[in-house]
């Protein structure tokens, strides 16, 4: 197993993902679980993928009729639809043609994660075991067996993390192939940033502060090593060129990317379904103040009063709504605190605004919708709760709730098994950090993943969205947790042998 080369391992990862995705889209959905099938291998609950498909078909038809001048990479802000339309134009309008692409993206991400873990374990067989949860968890079928933006995002994040690890190694240790690794790190950043730009551009805005702080730390480490005469000036110069190149990319990304589209991109599909029409909503809520309207609450009371005569229904609905209006989340006016730097205050304000969008979005998996942020201190106070949610949600009392679609209900049951595994290995992540506490890689990975997850925990009140959005980060931590578990077992065996 230790003689297995990276290319062959990538092919194993690819073939596994390809076969599972093909089986789901060509066999299971059409013939076994047809009530989950929306046609063309798409899940009825995968509203994002269905939407991408429809937009792509329309755009491909427009290109045929009017030429490429009407083409858009992001029609309606959706890059997966723009990419799909090209394939639909030249090949066939069927999302199942993307199975090789989604499989390749997932296999590549799994291989790089394998390389991360193998830096510490130095054993390919054990490192493969660590990557298995990332590779095989059923929740990743939302983007491996469906056409979605998350495949691009996942690989983009892992490529950026790979670049940071390479530069951290160059700064901290004596590394072979110094020039090659410098170029690989810059190339990895470029590819990662491009994939994030395609998938979720706002992540670049979140990643940028961490990258800048890390490079400041590496700059200090390099200077210390230089004054100790542990590094030659040529190596330092090349290292600084790499860092400056990446910082240039980061600065440009920060200018052209912002938090716009955060809510639209991560809104959970299960929470977009509503049987009430816009006309019904307007009639029922005609006399309710605009800032107190809630389609989901009104819909609930509409169902309750289904047998009440029409002439009395609206009055009863309005009276019932008055009683629950006090529980509707209220927006908090933002307060600028002078003792915080402007860039911190402005970013905190952006996060508060994004959270507001989730608080009022409704949905069956909404959590803490009554909590909003009025200043930076509010965010800091909520941080422990955000950590609890982002690491541990969905909680056991949510595992057996009913989803908006049968497929979502099934996914909640599956998430219960996944969460048990995640809980177990996160415990050993603590041991892994302690065991490899002198290795810079474990710190870069752990802090980076925790940082991004905390940002998500602060703003995303929808557990369904959060579960999908955090996948890359929490599964990286789980992989290192599995590595910690392996080392813990080996240490116990050695202790028993010695005793």
Regions found by a protein language model. Give the residues of each.
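Start-transfer (signal-anchor) and selected internal transmembrane alpha helices
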Residues: 1-32, 240, 499
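Short hydrophobic/aromatic helix or loop-helix immediately within or flanking a transmembrane segment
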Residues: 48-93, 199
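Transmembrane-helix motifs of polytopic, lipid-linked glycan transferases
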Residues: 84, 100-120, 424-427
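Transmembrane-helix signature of polytopic, membrane-embedded enzymes
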Residues: 96, 113-136
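Membrane-interface helix-loop-helix junctions at transmembrane boundaries of multi-pass membrane enzymes
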Residues: 119, 173-184, 226-230, 404-405, ...
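Membrane-interface alpha helices of multi-pass inner-membrane proteins
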Residues: 141-142, 176-207, 212, 243-246
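Short acidic/glycine- and proline-prone juxtamembrane loop motifs at membrane-interface regions
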Residues: 145-151
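Hydrophobic, aromatic-rich transmembrane alpha-helices
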Residues: 386, 390-395, 401, 412-439
């Amino acid at each position: 197993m230790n003689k297995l080369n990276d290319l062959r391992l990538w092919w194993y990862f690819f073939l596994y993902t390809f076969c599972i995705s093909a089986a789901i889209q060509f066999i299971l959905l059409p013939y076994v679980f047809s009530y989950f099938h929306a046609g063309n291998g798409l899940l009825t609950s995968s509203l994002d993928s269905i939407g991408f498909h429809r937009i792509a078909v329309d755009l491909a038809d427009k290109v045929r009729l009017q030429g490429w001048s009407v083409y858009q990479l992001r029609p309606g802000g959706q890059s997966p639809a723009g990419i799909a339309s090209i394939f639909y134009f030249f090949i066939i309008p069927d999302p199942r043609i993307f199975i090789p692409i989604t499989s390749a993206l997932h296999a590549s991400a799994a291989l790089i994660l394998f390389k991360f873990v193998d830096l510490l374990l130095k054993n390919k067989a054990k490192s493969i075991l660590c990557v298995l949860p990332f590779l095989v968890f059923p929740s990743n079928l939302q983007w491996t067996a469906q056409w979605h933006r998350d495949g691009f995002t996942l690989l983009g994040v892992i490529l950026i993390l790979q670049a940071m690890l390479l530069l951290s190694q160059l700064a901290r240790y004596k590394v072979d192939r110094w020039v090659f690794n410098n170029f690989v790190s810059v190339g990895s950043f470029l590819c990662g940033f491009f994939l994030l730009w395609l998938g979720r551009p706002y992540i670049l805005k979140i990643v940028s502060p961490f990258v800048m702080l890390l490079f400041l730390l590496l700059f200090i480490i390099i200077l210390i090593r230089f004054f100790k005469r542990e590094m030659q000036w040529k190596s330092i110069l090349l290292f600084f060129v790499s860092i400056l190149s990446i910082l240039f990319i980061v600065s440009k990304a920060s200018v052209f990317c912002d938090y716009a589209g955060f809510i639209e991109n991560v809104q959970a599909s299960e929470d977009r379904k509503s049987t009430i029409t816009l006309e019904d909503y307007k009639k029922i809520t005609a006399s309710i103040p605009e800032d107190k309207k809630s389609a989901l609450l009104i819909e609930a009371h509409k169902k309750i009063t289904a047998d009440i005569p029409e002439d009395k229904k609206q009055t009863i609905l309005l009276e019932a709504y008055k009683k629950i209006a006090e529980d509707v989340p209220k927006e908090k006016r933002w307060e600028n605190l002078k003792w915080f730097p402007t860039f911190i205050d402005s970013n905190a304000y952006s996060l508060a605004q994004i959270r507001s969008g989730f608080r009022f979005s409704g949905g069956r998996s909404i959590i803490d919708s009554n909590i909003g942020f009025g200043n930076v201190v509010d965010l800091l106070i909520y941080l422990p709760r955000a950590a609890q949610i982002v690491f541990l949600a969905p909680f056991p009392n949510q595992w057996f709730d009913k989803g908006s679609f049968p497929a979502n209900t099934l996914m909640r049951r599956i998430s219960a098994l996944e969460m048990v595994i995640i809980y177990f290995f996160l415990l050993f992540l603590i041991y892994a950090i302690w065991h490899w506490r002198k290795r810079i890689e474990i710190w870069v990975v752990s802090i980076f993943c925790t940082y991004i997850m905390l940002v998500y925990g602060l703003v995303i009140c929808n557990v369904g969205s959060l579960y999908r959005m955090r996948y890359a980060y929490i599964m990286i931590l789980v992989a290192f947790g599995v590595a910690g578990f392996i080392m813990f077992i080996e240490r116990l065996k050695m202790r028993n042998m010695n005793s």
